[in-house]
């Protein structure tokens, strides 16, 4: 299946690229998410008419992500969680907990933007987490998980 990308997609291409993808990936992910359109003659013509507008929107999204990165760089967020001996948490601190803590600190962050490659945090301590704000923009945030005072 050949599609036209309406935005930059990681490991696939940039705005306006015509790429061949597996039919299921195109029909079930790219098209419903608004990231691509099937490469038909009408859609190619439609895309060429709207290309400048789509490129402007992509630039605005990149600028907004850069501005959010400036706010997030150097930010330290503290999360309190119940823990037992040796700092082992009862439960874990996941992406939603981190996103809520950063949002409470004053910068809006969605759960899907928080990247935790080692999985949820299960022990108290300091962690450097990466936030994927845009396909080209990532920010580092320090998260301190401490034992909750009973």
UniProtKB/Swiss-Prot annotation:
GO cellular component terms, semicolon-separated: ribonucleoprotein complex; ribosome
Domain of life, per lineage: Bacteria
UniProt keyword Nucleotidyltransferase present: no
Keyword rRNA-binding carried by entry: yes
Alphabetical UniProt keywords: Ribonucleoprotein, Ribosomal protein, RNA-binding, rRNA-binding
A matching Pfam family: Ribosomal_L9_C
GO MF terms held by the record: rRNA binding; structural constituent of ribosome
UniProt xrefs under InterPro entries: Ribosomal_bL9, Ribosomal_bL9/RNase_H1_N, Ribosomal_bL9_bac/chp, Ribosomal_bL9_C, Ribosomal_bL9_C_sf, Ribosomal_bL9_N, Ribosomal_bL9_N_sf
SUPFAM superfamilies: L9 N-domain-like (SSF55658), Ribosomal protein L9 C-domain (SSF55653)
Record-level GO BP terms: translation
UniProt record similarity statement: Belongs to the bacterial ribosomal protein bL9 family.
Protein function: Binds to the 23S rRNA.
HAMAP family per record: Ribosomal_bL9
Name assigned to this protein: Large ribosomal subunit protein bL9
């Amino acid at each position: 299946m050949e599609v036209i990308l309406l935005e930059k997609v990681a490991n696939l291409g940039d705005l306006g690229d015509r790429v061949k993808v597996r039919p299921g990936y195109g029909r079930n992910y790219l098209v419903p998410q608004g990231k691509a359109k099937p490469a038909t003659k009408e859609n190619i013509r439609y895309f060429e008419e709207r290309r400048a507008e789509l490129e402007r929107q992509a630039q605005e999204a990149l600028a907004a992500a850069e501005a959010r990165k400036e706010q997030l760089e150097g930010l330290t967020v503290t999360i309190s969680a119940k823990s037992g001996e040796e700092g082992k948490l009862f439960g874990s601190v996941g992406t939603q907990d981190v996103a809520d803590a950063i949002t409470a600190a004053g910068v809006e962050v969605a759960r899907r933007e928080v990247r935790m490659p080692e999985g949820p945090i299960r022990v108290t301590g300091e962690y450097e987490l990466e936030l994927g704000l845009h396909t080209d923009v990532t920010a580092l945030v320090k998260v301190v998980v401490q034992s909750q005072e009973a």
